């Protein structure tokens, strides 16, 4: 919209009107006729991103719901010895926990 002096209001800002940039035409007028048919094809075709390929789930694979429904008895079956769950099986020797004795020598110097 173009403002004239007749509708000028002091202190009002100018309104910017957005418009589209001109598009490059790679061919002649045939581009215009083909654009309508290509837009119909684009509706049926996947537009981009990661395509999804749905495959059947193998019989041996557990469903996601199985992990949420496990009772405490069933969860112990997977980890027979929970204290050795992080070991690789190379060092099976049991270690005793030896708590450190408090060091009172530092207290005497202060």
From Swiss-Prot:
The keyword DNA repair is annotated on this UniProt entry: yes
Cross-link named Glycyl lysine isopeptide (Lys-Gly) (interchain with G-Cter in ubiquitin), sites: 15, 24
GO cellular component entries: centrosome; nucleus; perinuclear region of cytoplasm
Protein name, per record: PCNA-associated factor
Organism: Mus musculus
InterPro entries per UniProt: PCNA-AF (IPR040444), PCNA-AF_dom (IPR031444)
Taxonomy of the source species: Eukaryota, Metazoa, Chordata, Craniata, Vertebrata
Cross-referenced Pfam families: PAF
Motif (PIP-box): 61-71
Function in brief: PCNA-binding protein that acts as a regulator of DNA repair during DNA replication. Following DNA damage, the interaction with PCNA is disrupted, facilitating the interaction between monoubiquitinated PCNA and the translesion DNA synthesis DNA polymerase eta (POLH) at stalled replisomes, facilitating the bypass of replication-fork-blocking lesions. Also acts as a regulator of centrosome number.
């Amino acid at each position: 919209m173009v403002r004239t002096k007749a509708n000028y209001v002091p202190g009002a800002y100018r309104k910017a009107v957005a418009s589209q940039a001109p598009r490059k035409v790679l061919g002649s007028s045939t581009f215009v006729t083909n654009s309508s048919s290509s837009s119909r094809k684009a509706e049926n075709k996947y537009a981009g991103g990661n395509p999804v390929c749905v495959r059947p789930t193998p019989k041996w694979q557990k469903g996601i719901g199985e992990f949420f429904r496990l009772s405490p008895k069933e969860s112990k079956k997977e980890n027979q010895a929970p204290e050795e769950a992080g070991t690789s099986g190379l060092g099976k020797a049991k270690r005793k926990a030896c708590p450190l004795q408090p060091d009172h020598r530092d207290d005497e110097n202060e």
